[in-house]
Amino acid sequence: SILDTSGNELLLLTATGSAVNELTLANASTGNGPILSATGETNVDINLNPKGTGVLKSATAAVKIAGLETMWVPASAMYGATTNPAEAAQVETTALRPDMKVFDFAAAADDFVQFSVAFPKSWNEGTITYQAFWTPSTTNTGNCIWGLQGVSVGDGDTIDVAYGTAVTVTDAGIGTVEDQQVTAVSSAVTIAGSPAVDQQTYFQFFRDADVGGDTFTGVARLL
């Protein structure tokens, strides 16, 4: 251990058997900051592990940790597909209480909506997951199956391109009209194309109403 001027522990050093990776601390000249580097093998992480509920801080602010990010896309930001569109609607609950901007998905056949996103540059261009926020139009408790598929398009690419493989998620009707419903998190959705920075990603969202497992008999309202 390294002790401070009062004899208290300042830094504890723990040995690892057969270690090959280490930290290198370099000082700096005027106008430059010191550098803490991982050295050893070709690709080496630096692991900083706070204790308990502690967080990493820069100056006095907590450092944002990269990981799973969420993005809210409401029905009002979507548009009905030209072919087999879901029906856009504004549904009043009670006067001067929340109105719902929704897309209505019928039980008889597949309906579709679309939207697009230019993801933040911090996105790793990997798979995504999703949850559907919806509300039932009836008290039926059958299973409603939602689906999502996507494709990324870059500068100079054609937008006339097929969506990737759809991934579905199933949610049973809650049995109460106008109750909020949130599906489970879907499995991974692979976006078609070659996702990269500065691309626009198009999504198609639908109700898989004509598949045998969709037994919800009412209109499913996507929020």
Regions found by a protein language model. Give the residues of each.
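A short beta-strand element within beta-rich, extracytoplasmic domains
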Residues: G126-P136, C144
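Beta-strand-rich, repetitive solenoid scaffolds
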Residues: S1-T5, L10-E41, D45-K51, V55-T60, ...
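Proprotein-processing/basic-patch segments
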Residues: F206-L223
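Short coil-to-beta strand junction motifs in C2/discoidin
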Residues: N140-G147, G218-L222
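Short carbohydrate-recognition loop motifs
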Residues: T93-A108
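Extracellular carbohydrate recognition and processing domains
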Residues: D157-G193
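Short beta-strands within extracellular/lumenal beta-sheet-rich domains
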Residues: A106-S122
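Noncatalytic modules at the cell exterior or secretory-pathway interfaces
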Residues: S194-D210
